[in-house]
Amino acid sequence: MNQNEHPFAFPETKLPLTSNQNWQLSTQRQRTEKKSITNFTYQEFDYENISRDTLERCLTTIIKHHPIFGAKLSDDFYLHFPSKTHIETFAVNDLSNALKQDIDKQLADTRSAVTKSRSQAIISIMFSILPKNIIRLHVRFNSVVVDNPSVTLFFEQLTQLLSGSPLSFLNQEQTISAYNHKVNNELLSVDLESARWNEYILTLPSSANLPTICEPEKLDETDITRRCITLSQRKWQQLVTVSKKHNVTPEITLASIFSTVLSLWGNQKYLMMRFDITKINDYTGIIGQFTEPLLVGMSGFEQSFLSLVKNNQKKFEEAYHYDVKVPVFQCVNKLSNISDSHRYPANITFSSELLNTNHSKKAVWGCRQSANTWLSLHAVIEQEQLVLQWDSQDAIFPKDMIKDMLHSYTDLLDLLSQKDVNWAQPLPTLLPKHQESIRNKINQQGDLELTKELLHQRFFKNVESTPNALAIIHGQESLDYITLASYAKSCAGALTEAGVKSGDRVAVTMNKGIGQIVAVLGILYAGAIYVPVSLDQPQERRESIYQGAGINVILINESDSKNSPSNDLFFFLDWQTAIKSEPMRSPQDVAPSQPAYIIYTSGSTGTPKGVVISHQGALNTCIAINRRYQIGKNDRVLALSALHFDLSVYDIFGLLSAGGTIVLVSELERRDPIAWCQAIEEHNVTMWNSVPALFDMLLTYATCFNSIAPSKLRLTMLSGDWIGLDLPQRYRNYRVDGQFIAMGGATEASIWSNVFDVEKVPMEWRSIPYGYPLPRQQYRVVDDLGRDCPDWVAGELWIGGDGIALGYFDDELKTQAQFLHIDGHAWYRTGDMGCYWPDGTLEFLGRRDKQVKVGGYRIELGEIEVALNNIPGVQRAVAIAVGNKDKTLAAFIVMDSEQAPIVTAPLDAEEVQLLLNKQLPNYMVPKRIIFLETFPLTANGKVDHKALTRMTNREKKTSQSINKPIITASEDRVAKIWNDVLGPTELYKSSDFFLSGGDAYNAIEVVKRCHKAGYLIKLSMLYRYSTIEAFAIIMDRCRLAPQEEAEL
């Protein structure tokens, strides 16, 4: 190896880095502890008919000419200039006689080796000797030390030397040392605590929130990918002309096209972009790092590109001329500490070399990598054409996403560079055409015709064809089709006698049983609309629903004691009396487009809202499912869902329309897997339809108690909440050929709107996907600006088609807010978040607002907060849902110290829950009540919900009542069982099983141990009586007699 002494002298041996260089190097160090990533710029150029000696001599001249190439980048964040340095002979790979495929492989291997190298050398050079007297020059620069214009200058000077022209002398006052000291001295004058500096930082939006598939720190290696867009000289000049016409620079025009594309893939109107600006006016001809990054809040969407680009020009100029210098290293550190949205700030960058360059040679290949940059766009002029270089760390992003973004950028660039383009026109859609095509095809699948029947009509047709077939089984009771129809007609007659007319609303308020089904069929036969109102909620709330729905008649069960009227506004009719009335001879004529039922869901203002569903909307869903899964007369469903939960609509009308059988459990057995297994095995149930948590409970119980019940189920349909990734395989452990169906939708869209048949569950799945729209239903994934989101981009799920509700009963404002009519199509804004996969599959990503699902129930946290704030002495309350998939409710309360009584005892968690039980259904009462002095706040002064979530993990004991010790033998017995199941923990009378760490699996184990000890406990009892004190009382009541215990 030849070694030549570097000839230049440098005034100092140690030079501090600038803020920008510190940031680049520190980010690189963070990501290179165990990974392979460095900051570099790499270029390849071909040189024809030039000898290797000539090329080596010219390169050596340039390296000797620039002091920076003699430096070493050390671990102490300094550049060191040794007194004696050496230039190594350049590596050579002779491929002059190689075959083309071997040359291609060798060049690819060279690129891979060079780009993955962790070398900190300032410059690395290699030759590849190719056929036809061509030398491929490979040059890698350390970009912490050498910026983009310096790379350009390097190759310009090489061209200059090869043409025989000497290099100009360097000005001894224009040095890297002078520049670094100048920049660092300016930084010393910046007050990082000043209001102006902080004002700038706090007003910056987050970087584009692009979809990712992994965190960069977890990458073992990083492959940088370069993609290029070339704009012809003619189109480039047209773009420049139009830009100048509108008083914007071409650079801002290109950056604004970039921000428009980033806005669509990031689902945000405003985003932070890093401009890498090189200020070299006083340092012309020097190679070094002169970049001063500028963070600019850019607009990504306006009504027209003209307004967008003008806005961005203004924002850029304001940032560039800001009266307080904003150093990038300090900016990034500040932003990273503000919120999670700034976890990776300034990771997308724009830079350009449009003013001073026109490369005579075009690079054969190149790329640019930086540890703190995920995606960069660099604009240069090569041979009079605009070349836009996209460099991306593709491993961070979903496959082909950057390629799709590039295509959308190209389309918009091409449009804006047309000769007579009008930039004031509305921006076109940038959704890639192939994505739009896939979605249109999926949204039009299926040949199901819109039904012209009523929801109950097929049941009554089946009565004629199979009158003696079993319609309902409930324990030891059963009804055949003709008897059920007779009861329904008599019920309709009784309703008519009570003054019910076609279109009236009639409430059904009774516990689960045959009466519920008789009631809804009777109401529909009478031409009325059924309104299920659960008994499991305070009377005050029930009556508010009755009044809001304009209900006069309420069908009840004669044995339900909760249905005692508080006034004479309502007429209560028990179904047992109703079926003794004179039957209605023929059904009331109603149009299929008219309402069939109204289901009331939680409302954010504290008032429940009534979802109005038509006959044809609900029946369309039932028919689609029945046809898809060939539901018929031999099928039986275990109907677990409450009547006010719309899964019950399919349980009733899906099965009765197909000639099948409904198998019921009692109200107390709705959470009892013992009863479910018995019913499944005894009555040969073939179908399961519930929220995932209940099916999980069934499988868990079956495993613990060796039940074969799951093997009876040929079809399992789960919806209403997250579906565990383990459930499909656990089900198929019982039935290999079983069909496992994931479904989703909204009450406002007729039960379900999408379906997915789950076969295998790939390891990379985050959750079971939503799948595809049902026939005559459509989906869109829409961002906050009303644009269709590209693949992988999270947006709000909109449902369209024939299942859309008629609106919210007697609430035009809420209806207009959630139901939209666009270009002749009706859409319901679900408030759910989702995204498309490239094949058109929909993935559910959770809620976007304060609505949550707990145990399958849709709950508005705002309604809970209204109820909490109604409690005397409460200054402010916040409700949250805790947990990822299996959520529970928690409430945080700050008491009003001025209004709260001083003498009386303070409000405790148990009292709060008792007061809430008077206003809300039991499933809406938070399990955890935590009292605070003040609420934690974000940097923007809003309640910090993430901090509250963290508190729930530390404050489990505060959510329970005053810790009274365990006294009775029964309580001690319960505590021993709980400790055996949950592990040793301190328990009190008020200790709650589920707040003490119990889950569904643990609950089943407790029931199992109770049985062994001689207590015939049902699982539902533990859910209903979940404290030590309450469960001990129930256990005593369930003690078996000695001979029964012996038999057990």
UniProtKB/Swiss-Prot annotation:
- What would be the name of the gene that encodes this protein? angR
Instruction: Choose any GO biological process term that the UniProt entry carries and state it.
Output: amino acid activation for nonribosomal peptide biosynthetic process
Assigned protein family: Belongs to the ATP-dependent AMP-binding enzyme family.
Superkingdom in the source lineage:
Bacteria
- Positions the record marks as coiled coil are none
Name of the protein in question:
Anguibactin system regulator
- Pfam family name, one: Condensation
Report the GO molecular function annotations: DNA binding; ligase activity; phosphopantetheine binding
Listed pathway(s): Siderophore biosynthesis; anguibactin biosynthesis
Q: Which UniProt keywords apply?
A: Activator, DNA-binding, Ion transport, Iron, Iron transport, Ligase, Plasmid, Transcription, Transcription regulation, Transport
- InterPro entries referenced in this protein's UniProt entry, alphabetically: AA_adenyl_dom, ACP-like_sf, AMP-bd_C, AMP-bd_C_sf, AMP-binding_CS, AMP-dep_synth/lig_dom, ANL_N_sf, CAT-like_dom_sf
**The protein's role, per its UniProt record:** Bifunctional protein that plays an essential role in virulence. Plays a role in both the production of the siderophore anguibactin and the regulation of iron transport genes.
Q: Which GO terms describe its cellular component?
A: cytoplasm
Asked if tRNA processing is a keyword of the record, the answer is: no
Please list the residue ranges annotated as the Carrier domain.
965-1039
